[in-house]
Amino acid sequence: MKEKLSNYLLAAVLQAMLAVCRGTKMEFKGITKREEGRFITRYDVEYETVDGKQKIYEMISRSDDITDYDKLHGKVADAVVIIATDEADERIVLNKEFRMAVGDWVYNFPAGLIDPGEEPQQSACRELLEETGLELYRVDDMIGTSYSAVGFSNETNVCIVGKARGEFKESTSTFEEITPGWYTKAEVRELLKKYKFAARTQAFCYVWSRK
């Protein structure tokens, strides 16, 4: 019995020493493209855990050319998110949008992909105009870079914070169903109680509506 216990303890110590030698994080081993679509590509990412086990993680990306670790996590932002209020910071722009991936209406911030050659601020102005008809006439801040769905994708966003004005117009694309609106803090608090939000929009609106 003592001999078995000693062997068990020895094995545990050796395993712990091995983990220390490897470091405290998983080791990237490689990435394999599994399926390429028009807008997203699915990959299997292989890691080795600290105890030497293989971990295959399924993920999707906007990029169709991820071949190494640097391309997995070192890329430029894919999209912009626009956080726009009126001049007095009393109302915020939210889109009520039908999201096809979930088959439901969701409240979120205006957002969209950054076109090749565009700066994030340019993309923000274009996307806000296309989705709502409003003009982003002032940019106060640019927050980057964040992951939009870190559980299964390396898609990244830059948040553009600024002021908007103008009249609402229908989206310029029939592939999107969007109803934009101005909302006061009291109205946002009521929306949060009753309706579904994109996670980042929900978190920001909760804090903003209570300032």
Regions from the language model: what does each represent?
Residues 67-71, 103-108, 181:
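A short, polar/proline- and glycine-enriched secondary-structure boundary/capping micro-motif
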Residues 76-83, 88-126:
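Conserved Nudix-box catalytic region and its N-terminal flanking loop in Nudix hydrolases
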Residues 50-51, 86-89, 98, 163-167, ...:
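Short loop segments at secondary-structure junctions
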Residues 39-81, 88:
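Acidic, metal-coordinating catalytic segment for phosphate/diphosphate chemistry
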Residues 78-81, 112-200:
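Unchanged
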Residues 33-36, 71-74, 150:
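Short Gly/Pro-enriched turn/cap motifs at secondary-structure boundaries
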Residues 1-25:
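N-terminal amphipathic/basic-hydrophobic helices that include classical n-h-c signal peptides
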Residues 24-36:
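Short amphipathic beta-strand and strand-loop transition segments with alternating hydrophobic
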